[in-house]
Amino acid sequence: MQYKNQNLTHFVKAAGUAAKLSPGGLKTILNFMQKTPALLSDIGNNEDASVYQISPDLALVQTLDFITPIVDSAYHFGAIAAANALSDVFAMGAEVINALNIVGFDTCNHDLNILKELLEGANDKVKECNALVVGGHTIESTELFFGLSVTGKVHPSKFIANNTSKIGDCIILTKPLGTGILSTALKAQMLNQKHLDIMLKNMIELNYKASQIALKFHPSAMSDVTGFGLLGHLKEMLNKNISFEIFESELPFLDGVKEYFNMGLIPAGAYKNLEFIKELTPDLNEEKLLLCDPQTSGGLLISISEKDSLECLKKLEDENIQAKIIAKVVNKQENDIIIS
């Protein structure tokens, strides 16, 4: 569907995943959550989705994600929000079964045609990964928000956790960074059409194909890059035995991102993410804010053996996925994340 400027971002305080609460603050209030033997996923490291075993051969994968508008077109907002929510299941190496819509609708500023187009965009993305939208729930809200509750399935022994990287692995990122910067420029009405088109293409792309390709190479860990930024999600992938060495010169950014960054068009979420990550890399400064930029529908982080990394990269590139090797897993260092 053609992009329409329906002024969705004008009526919200923060756009997309930049509206998330600070990761540091959340960590202090979620320590009451309990685990049972059937819950296979780890609740202590902000896993992308829950994995709950219901039989010897089947586990349910469940996640929920909703965001405020990051673009001004209702159809594209719905598609992006859906891609963002579905990504958590793909990051677990699982298959999506169905999804439920979650809608907070601002009836004061939007008519029901906005809602119709939004739901159509989401439905098209869910169909793209051979799944179904089976219902949902809508409330009136002072700000528009939309997302999905997604259910998937996986064999209990075959899901991919986010904190099981092995020393020597390479880390592949499957999408360029910078959607937080570009969406901030859009909200400020300073984003040009070329960069808007680039941002839309990036965020609407599902991580479905990338996940399917990665699984052929038996990755040791996977996650996706969303609201906590590249460094925040790498932090969640750490374990007691490893650190990450990031190759700064290899980091991919969407066209125009550095230009808008230098103009000071930086989302508040980037500063929150920087504070969250400083305990691991104390010498981190505001020059590295780009690495903390909150992403919406960002790429996968795939931890894969060095011997398989180049072949995996080629398979991704053959599917027009803009993947890059951006880091290596090393023995535990004084700083858990090293930028070289």
Curated annotation (Swiss-Prot):
**Cofactor(s) for this UniProt protein:** Mg(2+)
Q: What is the catalytic activity of this protein? A: hydrogenselenide + ATP + H2O = selenophosphate + AMP + phosphate + 2 H(+)
Q: Which residues form the active site?
A: 17
This entry carries the following GO cellular component terms, namely: cytoplasm
Task: State the coiled-coil residue ranges.
Answer: none
Binding sites annotated in the UniProt record for Mg(2+): 48, 88, 224
Q: Which InterPro entries match?
A: PurM-like_C_dom, PurM-like_C_sf, PurM-like_N, PurM-like_N_sf, SelD_I, SPS/SelD
Q: Which Gene3D superfamilies does the record match to this protein?
A: PurM-like C-terminal domain, PurM-like, N-terminal domain
The GO annotation for biological process reads: selenocysteine biosynthetic process
- One Pfam family per UniProt: AIRS
Top EC category: transferase
Record keywords: Nucleotide-binding included?
A: yes
The UniProt entry, under HAMAP family, shows:
SelD (MF_00625)
Please describe the quaternary structure of this protein: Homodimer.
Task: Provide the family line.
Answer: Belongs to the selenophosphate synthase 1 family. Class I subfamily.
Q: What is this protein called?
A: Selenide, water dikinase
UniProt lineage:
Bacteria, Pseudomonadati, Campylobacterota, Epsilonproteobacteria, Campylobacterales
